[in-house]
Design a protein with these regions (language model features):
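Active-site flanking residues adjacent to catalytic metal/cofactor-binding acidic residues
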Residues: 38
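Rhodanese-like catalytic fold shared by cysteine-dependent sulfurtransferases
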Residues: 1-35, 43-84, 92-129
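Short, surface-exposed ligand- or partner-binding patches at beta-edge/loop junctions that are enriched
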Residues: 87
């Protein structure tokens, strides 16, 4: 049995999802201020670096449960219709997260190339948690 590597899984996801640059994120947030920016990093990462101002923290392990209306963990305040933009530290986990919710049926989803630091380098503010 040949197992797929994490790198292969990420590449498969990248081939099926939309990736935007931090500059495109800036334009998207201007054109669509209701778009939800979602940080899927571990809470320890957020405590160390903070998060992008205005982003929602949604731990990767809870993603599918928080977005599933039939789950006891469903978060009603995260509208299924709103555009969702995921980021992590680099862009591997966010690629997998984007593919997962796309597989759930969500349509307006993407992730940010380069992750947290690339977004910060584009001029986005950080807020401590």
């Amino acid at each position: 049995m040949k197992l797929k590597t994490s790198k292969e899984l990420v590449q498969e996801a990248m081939d099926k999802i939309k990736t935007i640059t931090p500059a495109e994120l800036k334009n998207l947030k201007i054109k669509n201020p209701d778009a939800i920016l979602i940080d899927i990093r571990d809470i320890r990462e957020l405590k160390k670096t903070g998060k992008i101002k205005g982003a929602i923290h949604m731990p990767r392990g809870m993603l599918e449960f928080w977005l599933d209306p039939e789950s006891p963990y469903y978060k009603k305040d995260i509208s299924p219709e709103k555009t969702k933009i995921f980021y992590c530290a680099s862009n591997w986990r966010s690629a997998l997260a984007t593919q997962a919710i796309q597989n759930m049926g969500f349509e307006n989803v993407c992730h940010v190339k380069g992750g947290f630091q690339a977004i910060v380098d584009e001029g986005f503010e950080i807020e401590k948690i």
